[in-house]
């Protein structure tokens, strides 16, 4: 959870627990909530809740990025759905600028709505500069998947790019804090769907 979203943690746990007991998805699959864990400053995980016990979250913290590496591999583990000129961007058309512009917008919105201090950055300048970054290598493929929308009573296409992009660290310093934060966000069409 980001910033002010942490205030809603007890309600999210309760809602999730109720939802999984009732069944989720088109086939009403049932699950059991056994534990909730929170990431610690050192990158580990600490249990903060088990059913029948009190919720004991640690205070939220803002992680500090390490120094920018000399070389960087961006892993796209979940489908990244980007649009460029009203078309979905495939593996052959991938450009770092599109990824970075979406990531910067996503982080900016998260900070605007979930933090007490607005993000101060040259958004236009950073976005323009992102289009000048070239990847060393890209091993991307399209991964198609669907999700069921109860509201629309239909399956929705949610496919996107998965794989990895290798970047030379030279010139990445202005982008690094956002790329590093991006490991905890989604960036692209449908990002709010998780």
Segments from the language model and where they lie:
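RNA-interacting cores
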Residues: 1-194
């Amino acid at each position: 959870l980001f910033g002010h979203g942490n205030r809603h943690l007890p309600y999210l746990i309760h809602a999730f627990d109720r939802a999984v007991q009732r069944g989720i998805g088109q086939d009403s699959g049932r699950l059991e909530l056994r534990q909730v864990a929170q990431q610690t400053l050192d990158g580990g995980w600490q249990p903060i809740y088990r059913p029948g016990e009190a919720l004991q979250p640690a205070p939220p913290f803002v992680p500090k990025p390490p120094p920018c590496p000399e070389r960087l591999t961006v892993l796209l583990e979940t489908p990244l759905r980007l649009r460029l000129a009203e078309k979905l961007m495939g593996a052959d058309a991938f450009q770092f600028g599109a990824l970075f512009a979406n990531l910067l917008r996503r982080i900016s919105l998260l900070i605007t709505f979930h933090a007490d201090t607005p993000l101060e950055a040259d958004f236009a300048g950073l976005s323009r500069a992102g289009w000048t970054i070239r990847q060393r290598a890209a091993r991307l493929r399209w991964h198609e998947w669907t999700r069921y929308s109860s509201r629309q009573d239909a399956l929705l296409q949610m496919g996107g790019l998965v794989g990895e992009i290798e970047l030379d660290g030279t010139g990445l310093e202005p982008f690094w804090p956002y790329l590093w934060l991006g490991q905890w966000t989604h960036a692209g069409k449908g990002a709010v769907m998780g």
